[in-house]
Amino acid sequence: MPDFPKEHATPMSNRPPAHQARKRFGQNFLRDTGVIDRIVRVIAPRSDQRLIEIGPGQGALTEPLLDAVGALEVIELDRDLIPGLRVQFFNYPDFVIHEGDALQFDFAALAAEGETPGKPLRVIGNLPYNISTPLIFHLLTARGAIADMHFMLQREVVERLAATPGSAAWGRLSVMTQYHCRVDNLFVVPAEAFTPRPKVESAIVRLIPHDEPPHVAHDEALFGDIVREAFGQRRKTLRNNLKTRLDDTAWAALDIDPGRRPQTLSVEELVRIANHVAETAP
C-alpha cells in the first residue's frame, strides 16, 4: 500500500479555518442537516465496525459518524482541508487521517492492518463527480476487504449503477458493478443541499459485494475485457464489437443473436459469452 501519511487529531481550538471549495478536486460541500441525518440512518454505523470515509471535506458526515461510533478513518487529498479536520475532531482519539489520493489507496492492505486485522471495511463518501467512476472500479478490486459502500454520487451515475438491461443507462459500469455487488439506489439529494450548489442532483447508493457472484466468470479479467469490448461502440452490434472473439458458430452455440446491441445483454449473458471464449481459446 502506498505510504500515505497517517495522523491522529491533535488538540487545538475546535473551530476549523475557512476553506473555499476547489473545482480541480470537484468539491461540493454537503450542508443540509436533514440529508446528513438521513444518510447516517441508512448507513446505520456500529461501534464494532471499521468505517472509512473518502473525502471528508469539512466534516459534514464525519462528525455524526464519529458521534455514533467514536472511531473513524478518513482519506483526504486536499492538504488545505487537513488542518481544519485535525482541529475540528481533536477530541476524538480514534479519528485517523490518511493524507492521499483514494484512487491510489490500498484498501485491502488497510483492512489487513490495525487493531482488528481482517475486519471488512465499511466505505463511505461524498465522492467528487470527476473521479466517481474510476474510484468505484478501483474499490471493486478490493471488494474482498469491503463489507459495504455508501456513496453520494451524481444522480446520473447512480442510475447507471442501478440500471437494468435494455435501458439507456445500462452499460459497462452497470455490468461490472452488478457482477460484483448488489446495488441499492436509496434516495435523491437535491442540488440545494450543497455549497457551492452543483448543476445536477445527487443520489445515495449502497453497494454490497457478493460473497459469490450470482453468475461466475471463469476468468474475471477476460470477462472485464469482453464487457469493455462489447460496450466499446454502443450503436454497433455484438457481431461487430466482438468479431475478433466469436464467429457465427459460437453465437449459435451460445443461443445469442449477434445482431443485438450490447445494452440489451444481461450480466448472465455476458458471463456466458466470456466463459465460452475462455473455454474455446486455443
From Swiss-Prot:
Q: Where in the cell is it found?
A: Cytoplasm
GO terms (molecular function) for this protein are: 16S rRNA (adenine(1518)-N(6)/adenine(1519)-N(6))-dimethyltransferase activity; RNA binding
Keywords (alphabetical) are: Cytoplasm, Methyltransferase, RNA-binding, rRNA processing, S-adenosyl-L-methionine, Transferase
Q: Which reaction does it catalyse?
A: adenosine(1518)/adenosine(1519) in 16S rRNA + 4 S-adenosyl-L-methionine = N(6)-dimethyladenosine(1518)/N(6)-dimethyladenosine(1519) in 16S rRNA + 4 S-adenosyl-L-homocysteine + 4 H(+)
Q: Major location, coarse class?
A: cytoplasm
Chain residues that bind S-adenosyl-L-methionine: N28, L30, G55, E76, D101, N126
Location of region: Disordered: 1-21
Spell out the Pfam families in the cross-references.
Answer: RrnaAD (PF00398)
Q: Which SUPFAM superfamilies match?
A: S-adenosyl-L-methionine-dependent methyltransferases
GO CC annotations, alphabetized: cytosol
What top-level class of enzyme does the UniProt entry assign?
transferase
EC number per UniProt:
2.1.1.182
**Statement: the UniProt record of this protein carries the keyword Coiled coil:** no
Would I find RNA-binding among this entry's keywords?
yes
InterPro entries noted in UniProt: KsgA/Erm (IPR001737), rRNA_Ade_diMease-like_C (IPR023165), rRNA_Ade_Mease_Trfase_CS (IPR020596), rRNA_Ade_methylase_Trfase_N (IPR020598), rRNA_adenine_dimethylase (IPR011530), SAM-dependent_MTases_sf (IPR029063)
Family membership, please give it: Belongs to the class I-like SAM-binding methyltransferase superfamily. rRNA adenine N(6)-methyltransferase family. RsmA subfamily.
**NCBIfam families per record:** ksgA
Protein name according to UniProt:
Ribosomal RNA small subunit methyltransferase A
Please give the organism.
Chromohalobacter salexigens (strain ATCC BAA-138 / DSM 3043 / CIP 106854 / NCIMB 13768 / 1H11)
